Amino acid sequence: MTIIVTGAAGFIGANLVKGLNDRGETDIIAVDNLTRADKFRNLVDCEISDYLDKTEFVERFARGDFGKVRAIFHEGACSDTMETDGRYMMENNYRYTLALMKACLDQGVQFLYASSAATYGASDTFREDREFEKPLNVYGYSKFLFDQIVRRTLPGALSQIVGFRYFNVYGPREQHKGRMASVAFHNFNQFRTEGTVKLFGEYNGYPQGGQMRDFVSVEDVVKVNLFFFDHPDKSGIFNLGTGRAQPFNDIATTVVNTLREAEGKPALSTEELAQEGLVEYVKFPDALRGKYQCFTQADQGKLRAAGYSAPFLTVQEGVARYCRWLMAQPA
């Protein structure tokens, strides 16, 4: 049966297409908006059966134009947390997703969609519960509002609905994202071009480079998506992070040491890298004061209770693997 991936040429979408291919699935309809044409590169090594623009897709799917569809992985959205056009954000992230979910429910199609840890915003607890959801921007609000609709819909739903609250995802196929690409991607390119990695200095009780996030490899993101794809009886909204906050220093140290290793140089500690000027700390920007999350860490209780038991890659494992992938890409 056909599988549909929206946002298929994007970061997580393209990795999902590749993950499905690795399982022998090739009857995949890719849906995206290729206004940013360079995204096509993410699909060059993937097998798909068709491509559609997002503007024509929902209406055609609701009409049943694609026959029997098993599942939709909905990764297509505006993921720019700095976007200030609320009307565009709500139309793209909320209304479009709502129409797609309704069409899936009408046809009994599994619906697996991208939510976001941005729904938690100013919270210091990251558990899938309404009391901890305090979005700070319209992107977070668009995801938050749709999650509320899902909660009201689930009791009467006759087919699977699963939302994944992605934390700080990094990994292959994100190069088109510009400023919204991961810290690992930016650290890698900064070190290659400037010979140093710059991190924020101390702020809000956290030491220099010590602000912490839940950094999760896209490899694990794909595995969790496919676990729920294989278990259509499981529905709900789930955090998708490692459950382990790590400091930005860990990202920078892993990036620099992986690049040093490729040159036959020994690994250095974070302190040694700073002493050598390979990691530098800059004053925390005034513009970000009061608007910056210094700590995120996924509560994995609900995910583990649903039966997902595989371990997650640490920064040291996942970022090193990602850097080696980046080094292998053509210039």
Curated annotation (Swiss-Prot):
Pfam families assigned: Epimerase
SUPFAM superfamilies with a match to the protein in the record: NAD(P)-binding Rossmann-fold domains
EC number: 5.1.3.20
Cofactor binding note from Swiss-Prot or TrEMBL: Binds 1 NADP(+) per subunit.
Isomerase listed as a keyword: yes
Active-site residues, Swiss-Prot/TrEMBL: 139, 177
Gene3D superfamilies, per database record: NAD(P)-binding Rossmann-like Domain, UDP-galactose 4-epimerase, domain 1
Single GO term (MF): NADP binding
Transmembrane segments: none
Binding positions (NADP(+)): 11-12, 32-33, 39, 54, 75-79, 92, 143, 169, 177
InterPro entries for this protein: Epimerase_deHydtase, Heptose_epim, NAD(P)-bd_dom_sf
Any one Gene Ontology BP term: ADP-L-glycero-beta-D-manno-heptose biosynthetic process
Cofactor(s) it depends on: NADP(+)
UniProt-annotated binding residues for substrate: 168, 179, 186, 200-203, 213, 292
Keywords: Carbohydrate metabolism, Isomerase, NADP
Catalytic activity line of the entry: ADP-D-glycero-beta-D-manno-heptose = ADP-L-glycero-beta-D-manno-heptose
Pathway note: Nucleotide-sugar biosynthesis; ADP-L-glycero-beta-D-manno-heptose biosynthesis; ADP-L-glycero-beta-D-manno-heptose from D-glycero-beta-D-manno-heptose 7-phosphate: step 4/4
Subunit structure, as described in the record: Homopentamer.
PANTHER family: ADP-L-GLYCERO-D-MANNO-HEPTOSE-6-EPIMERASE, NUCLEOSIDE-DIPHOSPHATE-SUGAR EPIMERASE
Domain writeup: Contains a large N-terminal NADP-binding domain, and a smaller C-terminal substrate-binding domain.
Function noted in UniProt: Catalyzes the interconversion between ADP-D-glycero-beta-D-manno-heptose and ADP-L-glycero-beta-D-manno-heptose via an epimerization at carbon 6 of the heptose.
Family per similarity comment: Belongs to the NAD(P)-dependent epimerase/dehydratase family. HldD subfamily.
This protein's name: ADP-L-glycero-D-manno-heptose-6-epimerase
Organism field: Ralstonia nicotianae (strain ATCC BAA-1114 / GMI1000)
